[in-house]
A protein has these predicted regions:
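Structural alpha/beta surface segment adjacent to cysteine/selenocysteine redox centers
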Residues: 77-112
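Typically the conserved alpha-helix immediately C-terminal to a functionally engaged Cys/Sec
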Residues: 49-63
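Thiol-based oxidoreductase modules, predominantly thioredoxin-like and allied folds used
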Residues: 64-84
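A short beta-strand-turn-helix
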Residues: 19-35
């Protein structure tokens, strides 16, 4: 019941009259999932070593779900090529803001640039699943409303 109330509250936030579509570095292709899960990681990051096994376990449950999983690996400090990935995914502004930081997964709306939630090592597997489920519902509802 609490999960449903949380989802409805989140949906209300995004369907409010002041909802504004942000401009991005080009429109995302229509076949790309709206929900983006962007992992900022490196091999030397302690938080990454805690978070990543949890994400991998949970990710298996979401094969075929409308989630675009993107991974930015800052292990060698090289940023060349990573921004190209961000541009291709339509999330360059997010990358520009967070490049070099590690140890978290950003759940965001590709079309508006809205960051829904930042998942850290403090999240357990169940909390990660709840976050993914919550924002999948929101993005699906946004698409259905916008498609009318």
């Amino acid at each position: 019941m609490r999960l449903i109330a949380t989802m409805l509250a989140g949906l209300a936030l995004f369907l409010a009259p002041n909802f504004v579509r942000a401009s991005w570095d080009g429109a995302a292709p229509a076949d790309e999932p709206r929900l983006v899960a962007a992992l900022f990681r490196s091999s030397w990051c302690g938080a990454c070593r805690v978070l990543e096994p949890r994400l991998e376990d949970v990710r298996e449950d979401y094969d075929g779900a409308a989630i675009d999983w993107v991974r930015f690996n800052f292990t060698w400090g090289e940023r060349n090529g990573l921004r190209d990935i961000a541009v291709a995914e339509g999330i360059a502004p997010l990358y520009d803001e967070l490049a070099g930081r590690t140890g978290f997964l950003v759940l965001m709306d590709r079309e508006t640039g809205q960051v829904f939630e930042i998942i850290t090592m403090d999240y357990g597997r169940d909390q990660i699943r709840e976050a993914l489920d919550r924002w999948l519902v929101v993005t699906e509802r946004l698409e259905s409303v916008e498609g009318q």
